[in-house]
């Protein structure tokens, strides 16, 4: 009898382990739910996670998870995990868009969306939504924007989950792996866009045995210092726009010397201007700055479709009509600012280049340096900044015209990942090339391929066939054409009267 006790003890221990595993798998109960933009029911659930990983019994946060079930009855065991951008974007709020982008993949695979901690409904770190007028004021006045961020930081730190040190990418990827385990998936496919590519790379680094395939679009590697590269990459994309306009006959005729026009416009700043609010119809007077002018152009560079309007908008601004350019301020993504700065201030800001001369702290660099000065910084392991070789296929997509994550970042990452990685550039597209139909098909074949060799051999030829949209000239109303002949219109060769600034810019409401 005594000789059999160890076997019984081992059996009891084994059952205990199985019970523990079952308990873990059951820790994410799912229920049917309806989400905006989805054609079918989804499955929603909440996973409890410790705010501080070192204190598993301490403050807990709710991690919100959505599973969009595969349509087929006999689904495949490797779901797709999607990582949103920002940092600070909610993946769940993008459910309809992501379901559309992955519709063919969703036939036989579940799609898993997680509101990363700090985003969406997962311990949200959102600042108060400013009015359109206040947003404009912050864009025109950096100190006002920094003061608003400081106020937001103080308010966020009063929340039960307000220790801003615990929202880094490595901690978020530990959350992701807990979701994978709770769902009972052994290996998963990763799809990441923009900041989601950094998250995907960190998951691959930390949990390589649980990754089957990975596709990342608009690559932002962990060692990329966003505040340092942001303005440089945007300027390169704008220079490409000027070159393409000069090379296209119709654009060159409509907008001769576009690059010089832009430089002259920048040189004229700061400049008092006026704009008409499209909602109220009232004229307001503001001072346009170089920094604000550059920020207005940037959204138009993300998409070549929007970029097709930029030559016209720049020429109109140079003529004193800022309405078209100001319209770009309305395009952007909804992010949780607290999560955004918790990530950037911990992972990027400590590695920023020092300010070393006039203008070196303009634009994004100056904003992040000031905002991060008082922002709590989480610990980031040195291994986070490394990119080990990958044992699984990785597809890296880039837009040749991308103003924030151009191909140079993806090419460097692909080299580090090794022979299992493949970098593909869509030369005539900007940020997020997965939105292009033929690239969605290519991604489907990459993920769906039966073998790694087949995945690496998927035809990506359509990337070279995507054209750049032609420059677009919107029809002008009669009153705008008459204004072009007004002798009192904006002239950057002489100062404007503060009593009667020139007609111009409309606000984004």
Predicted regions, residues:
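Long, low-complexity segments enriched in small/aliphatic residues
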Residues: 314-351
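Sec/Tat signal peptide C-region and signal peptidase I cleavage site
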Residues: 21-25
